[in-house]
């Protein structure tokens, strides 16, 4: 999986480098973007390799972590794993990290109950001793950068989570990068004002991330393993595929067209009902997905449909392709209407609203 990034992406990487260069940062750096837009991919395959000789990166996924204690253990575990890798890469015969753990165990072993001492091999494992291990913002003379990913996917409250991250940044001196979908954090926050206030104290800067959709689509097509004819179909429709993924539609025009078509003079509907319909449409358009993973899955899945269409001697499959991609993107985003009492007819109305002229 490879995506190339434009000059704007390179500037973003420079911003990340500049933050890592700061000594004793006053706050964390947040890289914010929609789910599936390539944030983590950029960090792990573009940014980290570009500075791997200067810094040590400890990456922690917050997905599914439901307590601060578990988070602290996970941070230490990832730190220890990285330290062990570092030792191995430098040819150290016995990991200094393991030696540290053994020394700590020897210190506490004498204080354990006798029946625990007999089962010392269980307690003496590195993972059992994580809570006794101090971690440092330096690892073998290199600065350690903490990277917290999937901030919005944890079950810990935003306030508690950011407070914990702030402890690493402010009190322990770690440069800290947060990778998140900030809009989803706001959606799940019980008190958005509280989140905004604590974010202002803890997050030094927020960098919005928007991928280069033209390059994403182009590389997705060129790197895809598929039949020559099917790849030709994708290339033929590349500009429209970019339009679908980027969501490059005139939403104001869509709303005006909807109003002209549906708002009838002399109708029994009240003004408030029309306003409610318009607000619902605006909300739907604001949720138009840009998920790269969903897009890649859709163009891969359509190849089977394409092969069936070819067997049926259907000459031009472009409309089928575009409609399928629109439908799958909408479905993956959970935006398909499923009103069973009307059958299947009304399932696709949202797709038509999101992707006019293409579905």
Indicate where each model-derived feature is located:
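Pre-Walker A adenine-sensing motif
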Residues: 2, 7-24
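Extended alpha-helical coiled-coil/bundle linker/stalk regions that scaffold oligomerization
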Residues: 296, 300-359
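Short regulatory helix/loop adjacent to the ATP-binding pocket of P-loop NTPases
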Residues: 184-203, 221-222
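P-loop NTPase nucleotide-binding core
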Residues: 27-28, 33-34, 40-141
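Conserved small helical "lid"/interfacial subdomain of P-loop NTPases
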Residues: 203-274
């Amino acid at each position: 999986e490879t995506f190339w990034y434009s000059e704007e992406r390179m500037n973003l990487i420079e911003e990340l480098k500049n933050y890592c260069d700061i000594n004793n940062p006053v706050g964390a750096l947040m890289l914010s973007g929609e789910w599936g837009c390539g944030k983590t991919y950029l960090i792990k395959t573009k940014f980290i390799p570009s500075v791997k000789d200067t810094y040590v990166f400890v990456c922690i996924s917050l997905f599914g972590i439901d307590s601060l204690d578990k988070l602290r253990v996970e941070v230490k575990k990832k730190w220890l794993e990285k330290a062990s890798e570092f030792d191995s890469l430098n040819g150290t015969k016995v990991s200094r990290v393991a030696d540290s753990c053994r020394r700590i165990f020897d210190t506490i072993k004498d204080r354990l109950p006798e029946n625990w001492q007999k089962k010392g091999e269980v307690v003496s494992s590195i993972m059992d001793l994580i809570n006794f291990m101090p971690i440092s913002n330096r690892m073998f003379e290199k600065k350690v950068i903490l990277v917290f990913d999937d901030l919005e996917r944890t079950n810990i409250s935003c306030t508690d989570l950011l407070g914990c991250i702030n402890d690493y940044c402010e009190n322990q001196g770690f440069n800290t990068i947060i990778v998140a979908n900030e809009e989803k954090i706001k959606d799940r926050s019980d008190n958005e004002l509280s989140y905004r206030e604590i974010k202002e104290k803890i997050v030094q800067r927020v960098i919005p991330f928007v991928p280069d959709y033209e390059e994403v689509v182009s590389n997705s097509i060129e790197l895809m393993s598929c039949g020559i004819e099917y790849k030709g179909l994708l290339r033929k429709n590349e500009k429209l595929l970019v339009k679908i993924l980027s969501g490059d539609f005139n939403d104001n025009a869509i709303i005006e067209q909807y109003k002209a078509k549906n708002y009838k003079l002399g109708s029994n509907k009240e003004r408030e009902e029309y306003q409610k319909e318009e607000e619902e449409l605006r909300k739907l358009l604001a949720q138009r997905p840009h998920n790269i993973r969903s897009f890649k899955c859709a163009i891969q899945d359509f190849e089977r449909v394409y092969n069936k269409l070819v067997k049926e001697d259907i000459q031009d499959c472009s409309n089928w392709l575009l409609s399928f991609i629109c439908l799958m993107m909408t479905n993956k985003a959970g935006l398909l209407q499923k009103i069973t009492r009307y059958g299947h007819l009304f399932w696709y109305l949202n797709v038509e609203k999101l992707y006019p002229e293409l579905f």
